[in-house]
Amino acid sequence: MKLITFSLWGDNPKYTVGAIRNAELAPTIYPGWKCRFYVGTSVPNPIVWQLEAFEHVEVVMMDVPGDWTGMFWRFYPASEPDVEVMVSRDTDCRLGAREKAAVDEWMAADKGFHIMRDHPHHGFPILGGMWGAKKGAFPTMREAIDDWSKTDAYGTDYEFFANVVLPALENEDVMVHDEFFVKREFPTPREGLEFVGEVYDESENNIEDHTRVLKNFLKNKIKK
């Protein structure tokens, strides 16, 4: 089984509508893959029903409303023996061709773990919605999550990856796509100011400041 995993809680349309939008995009961007949404009890029923209506979507209802520690739910499949490969994504981002080309390159390589960074602000070892793992790459993920002292704060998953996951990985088993910090280009040219991990609201508006930062970085890169 090939999985695209998401965590979802609350009623903020930035995330709930984003979840629906990613479910709509998945068959085109990731044909043959399934989406699995880990959903807190705080998500409105109509959103849950819409997700359940997609044939390629699995909804796993959690028994708690959800908070920032819910970010970890989507990481669980890395430990499941029937999951061939999984990629973890954010509901406020959008699946796209640029990331899929990077995933395809990783899938064809003899590497178990995949990391993407595609913006000057992506200065973390592993971003919770921009990584993937093949079966066996980190089989103790569930146990590691259970043992980690999670906090209800944005970025708690970044700390987990930096302190627990990354030190346990062997460098030769990791493929990184990142032109900013590692200097490994994505396999497809950047179209305009697009970037993997770009955040959108429920009306498909992005964050202008993020675009400006990327534009300035690329402009300076060309000058050099």
For the regions a protein language model found, what residue spans apply to each?
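Catalytic core and acceptor-binding pocket of nucleotide-sugar-dependent glycosyltransferases
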Residues: 121, 133-224
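N-terminal anchoring/stem segment of glycosyltransferases
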Residues: 1-64
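A short acidic-Thr-Gly-centered motif at the start of a beta-strand
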Residues: 74-82
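Short conserved active-site loop signatures built around small residues
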Residues: 92
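Conserved donor-nucleotide/metal-binding helix-loop-beta segment in metal-dependent transferases, i.e.
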Residues: 95-126
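Conserved hydrophobic/aromatic beta-strand scaffold that supports enzyme active sites
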Residues: 77, 113-115, 130-132, 160
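Short aromatic/hydrophobic "clamp" motif used to bind/position activated sugar donors
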Residues: 86-88
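A short, glycine-/small-residue-rich helix N-cap motif at loop->alpha-helix starts
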Residues: 65-73
